[in-house]
Amino acid sequence: MKPYISIVIPTLNEQDNMHKLLEGIHSVIKDYRYEVIIVDGHSRDHTVKFARQMGATVIYDDKGKGSALRKGLAAAKGKIIISMDADLSHRPNELKLLIAGIEAGYDVCMGSRFLTGGGSDDMPLTRIIGNKIFVAIVNILYGSHYTDMCYGYRSFARGVSRKLSLEEDGFGIETEISIKAQKKHLRALEVPSYEKLRASGEGKLRSLGDGAIILRTILKNL
């Protein structure tokens, strides 16, 4: 029997992306039993209405991406739990690759834009350099071999989020997951992922401020 899948998606004012995203998810994993959990930061548009119309479960958290992800992971019922963004930058056709990584026995499976077959339409030079610097620092300090650090398209075996004891409320959450997976000797796999441009709406990432948050996350977990 195929595993039950939970997909956790933090949202804030993503109404224009909801239908295409949820239709894309369904088209790829319609042969699985699955749930979609929208963790909404009190959107001012019709994100919640559209998500519910498409059959998603909606819960609320407005403390930041990390807090929303932690709340969604805690609510998920699936044997395999997947985190993805709402802006269509994460391609639904890669879902089965993330599922396969957990089915193969890994605890965490992480999309990487820097493996062969991966890439990005939305990574200016400053972000490329920043990501590579953060990856190098983490690999040196923690003895890991990651290629990507700040990318949220990931899958988890059930129970892994409790083992990780995540604390980050903001954009440091992906870095915290990577570091704690290494520190707790979890089996982690990177798979190629191609990041598309945000389809609609306003991005929430702020390179300088969020870079400082990521650096703080790296250092505080030493």
Language model features with spans:
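Short, acidic, metal-binding catalytic loop of nucleotide-sugar glycosyltransferases
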Residues: 23-33
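N-proximal low-complexity "stem/linker" segments adjacent to membrane-targeting elements
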Residues: 1-24
